[in-house]
Amino acid sequence: MGTKVILGIIGAIVLIAIVLGLSVVGPYNTLVRLDQAVQAQWAQVENVYQRRADLVPNLVETVKGASNFEKDTLTAVTEARAKVGQVTPGAMQNIVNDPATFQRFQQAQDGLSSALSRLMVVAERYPELKATQNFRDLQVQLEGTENRIAVERMRFNESAQAFNTQRESFPTVFIAGFFGQKFQPKVYFKAQTGAEKAPAVKF
């Protein structure tokens, strides 16, 4: 076999190796970028949820000042906030890859949303409470925070969907499978059950 033939074979092998390498590096880097985007958006979700949790103690103390305010409603808010504290993942970086933990997190947050919604509806029955500046300020802050939560959840779902779509595309799906736990499918927020219905309040 001549030298030119050998060099030609070696060149072909090198070229194939380069092509295969590029076909892996590109999708891998895309997955890394999209995964980082999901993690960054999740941090924003945690921030707005924490902001809401921080408002609850002041809100509860303010509402306590209203005479004969429903104790059950206050208790429900306090207990819901406590449950949020029990399941908030904090330093757990893989919650977006863990459907069970993510579901517990969402259920706790949705429970607090429902409790706060009921509290605000009940507060309409107490004109003296609504007249206080502190309550009005907290109400505005809470409403703003709830809006931010909705926006950040939507953005998180969009980033998770972008990752999952890319992950399932060819040939990325094989690369994701090869790296196993590193590129697990991302979970989504689901609409809160009964969110389309106003909370029922007995008068």
Language-model segments: which ranges?
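A helix-centric hydrophobic-segment signal that preferentially recognizes long
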Residues: 1-203
